UniProtKB/Swiss-Prot annotation:
Keyword check for Transmembrane: yes
Top-level taxonomic group: Archaea
One GO-annotated biological process of the protein: protein transport
UniProt GO cellular component terms: plasma membrane
Record protein name field: Preprotein translocase subunit SecG
Length: 60
């Protein structure tokens, strides 16, 4: 059975990915918005667009 040379060690993990993870771990100030808020904002925006289209005569 062939063995790996003694001088070679396992390759270390990529440093770039470690840097990205460290960047996201350092981020403390975040705007936290619940999924329900995003859904409600989308529905309100859609209804507002429909109402404005009907009011200004753009409704087919």
């Amino acid at each position: 059975m062939a063995k790996a040379p003694k001088g070679k060690a396992k390759t270390p993990p990529l440093m770039s990915s470690a840097g990205i993870m460290r960047y996201f771990e350092e981020e403390k100030t975040q705007i936290k918005v619940s999924p329900k808020t995003i859904l409600a904002a989308g529905i309100v925006t859609g209804v507002l667009i429909i109402i404005l289209n009907a009011y200004y005569g753009l409704w087919p």
